[in-house]
Amino acid sequence: MSLRSLTLALALLLSVLCPASLCAQEGAVERQPYLDLRRYYIGFRLGLHLPDVRITNSGAVNSLGGQLWADSPVWHPGFSIGVIGGVTLVPQLELRLLPTLHLGDVPVAYTDGSQEVERLSLRTSCLQLPLELKWAALRWGNYRPFVAAGGYAALQLGARSSELLYLLPIDYGLSIGAGCDLYFSFFKLSPQLTFHYGLANLLQTHRPDLQGDPRIRFTEAVRGMATRALLFTLSFE
């Protein structure tokens, strides 16, 4: 499934959930009417994410006289868990810090132009530290839609320097998302869809440790790698 079709599917899910909740609010008693007047708040979130890498092929001719092209052919869903710390700046505008652990991997397939010749598993587990602004609409009963945007830094976990595709440990990028707050008697549930776009080239291209190894052709075939991910979370506050 492509990123576009998956994004549309999740966006459709949000659009179904939110209007359904909205329609149910007419005449409903507001639950926790003072919840959003808090100056500070905490919470946690659970979710699934689809990690991916944007690959820049070098087009280099390898020692066998051919060329290789790398791509990420399929999606492998990963698991995400994190905590939430927020401060209300003004009514409807919040600043949130969202330390999150993402566990997952990305398959990278190499072709010679006619067939696949190799497939590697690229570890993309990371500890991510997003900082985002959340702007919410006026509350309608027990429902409130919102949008969020910000940036993040991330520490890659589990990568080994001996791997053919070795990712540098520090990543950073931008994020944008949307969701809705659903108010219940004892907590607030917030489904959210977020897109992360990495800005750093994480690939370690200088690999003297692989000199003399025939597999270095898989490393030299790639000039750059940057991350991106689609994240669906359920936040509890």
Question: What is each model feature region?
Answer:
Residues 24-78, 235-237:
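Short glycine/proline- and aromatic-enriched beta-strand/turn motifs that initiate or cap beta-hairpins
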Residues 29, 169, 183-237:
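Predominantly the C-terminal beta-signal and adjacent terminal strand-loop region
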Residues 29-31, 66-71, 114-121, 160-166, ...:
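Extracellular loop and loop/strand-boundary signature of outer-membrane beta-barrel proteins
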Residues 38-40, 75-79, 123-129, 143, ...:
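Residues that define the transmembrane beta-barrel architecture of outer-membrane proteins
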Residues 44-48, 79-89, 99-101, 129-135, ...:
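Residues on the lipid-exposed face of transmembrane beta-strands in outer-membrane beta-barrel proteins
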Residues 51-52, 58-116, 231:
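Glycine- and aromatic-enriched membrane insertion/assembly motifs of diderm outer-membrane
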Residues 55-61, 107-115, 157-165, 202-210:
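Outer-membrane beta-barrel translocator domains and adjoining extracellular loop/strand segments
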Residues 92-95, 141, 186-189:
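Repeated loop/turn-to-beta-strand initiation elements of outer-membrane beta-barrel proteins
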